[in-house]
Curated annotation (Swiss-Prot):
Belongs to the SAICAR synthetase family. It is an enzyme of class 6 (ligase). Pathway: Purine metabolism; IMP biosynthesis via de novo pathway; 5-amino-1-(5-phospho-D-ribosyl)imidazole-4-carboxamide from 5-amino-1-(5-phospho-D-ribosyl)imidazole-4-carboxylate: step 1/2. It catalyses: 5-amino-1-(5-phospho-D-ribosyl)imidazole-4-carboxylate + L-aspartate + ATP = (2S)-2-[5-amino-1-(5-phospho-beta-D-ribosyl)imidazole-4-carboxamido]succinate + ADP + phosphate + 2 H(+). NCBIfam families: purC. One of its GO terms (biological process) is cobalamin biosynthetic process. This is Phosphoribosylaminoimidazole-succinocarboxamide synthase. GO terms for cellular component: cytosol. InterPro entries: SAICAR_synt/ADE2_N (IPR028923), SAICAR_synt_PurC (IPR033934), SAICAR_synth (IPR001636), SAICAR_synthetase (IPR050089), SAICAR_synthetase_CS (IPR018236). One of its GO terms (molecular function) is ATP binding.
Length: 237
């Protein structure tokens, strides 16, 4: 599949068109960002790790009946995907308190959330991805009520699948975000799942094994990503 024009360049991925109008090439770069892209550093192997990590997770979710945009791996850092009309809303599930929830409510980090919380955020870096609710989505026309309900259902289903995968690997899935789009009128899971967009803690030590290591200057970012990948069975080079 030939890579043509650059369609979109995000904080850590670049999207290219192909000769097929329904297919895109997703390229994972070594960039790592924080503070809505204000702080950016590069880490060797990160693009390769996240590409293979994402393919592994998306394959597991597809096997569980969740429609995803993946088609196939093209290289260490490239993947062929379906072209989705992306919904500008992020879905977040929180199994434990961390990040913005702790800051907003003053609850203890690590507090078990049962049942898990479901949050929505508008994708807008300039506005720091503001938290919204379901009525905002329909009133402003970001996504229809039926499609939003489907996104919520698939996010919870993904949480069930992924929580078990990580638990079996000695890890806690603290929280994560998912993004969806439309393909032929149907809601499909897009973007990525990796330690960039999730929080993963070691079950025994509670060590952070995700991008919080970068955000909080803990060091060992790539080592943590590789360890998580190894534990769940992701094949790296």
């Amino acid at each position: 599949m030939q890579k043509l024009a650059e369609l979109y360049r995000g904080k850590a991925k670049t999207v290219y068109t192909t000769e097929d109008p329904d297919l895109l090439i997703l390229t994972f770069r070594n960039d790592t960002s924080a503070l809505d892209g204000q702080r950016i550093e590069q880490f060797d192997r990160k693009g390769m790790i996240n590409n293979n990590f994402n393919y592994f997770i998306m394959t597991k979710l597809a096997e569980a009946g969740i429609p995803t945009q993946i088609v196939r791996l093209l290289s260490d850092n490239e993947m062929l995907v379906k072209k989705l009309a992306m919904v500008p809303v992020e879905c977040v599930v929180r199994n434990r308190a961390a990040g913005s929830l702790v800051k907003r409510l003053g609850v203890e980090e690590g507090l078990v959330l049962d049942p898990p919380l479901f949050d929505l955020f508008l994708k807008n870096d300039a506005m720091h991805d503001p938290m919204i609710n379901e009525s905002y989505c329909t009133t402003f026309g970001w996504v229809s009520e039926p499609h939003l309900a489907r996104m919520k259902q698939l996010t919870y289903q993904a949480n069930d699948v992924l929580s078990k995968i990580f638990d079996d690997a000695g890890l806690i899935l603290v929280d994560f975000k998912l993004e969806f789009g439309l393909f032929n009128g149907e809601i499909v899971l897009g973007d990525e799942f990796s330690p960039d967009g999730s929080r993963l803690w070691d079950k025994t030590t509670l060590d952070k094994m995700d991008k919080d290591r970068f955000r909080q200057n803990l060091g060992g970012v790539i080592e943590a990503y590789e360890e998580v990948a190894k534990r769940i069975g992701v094949t790296l080079d």
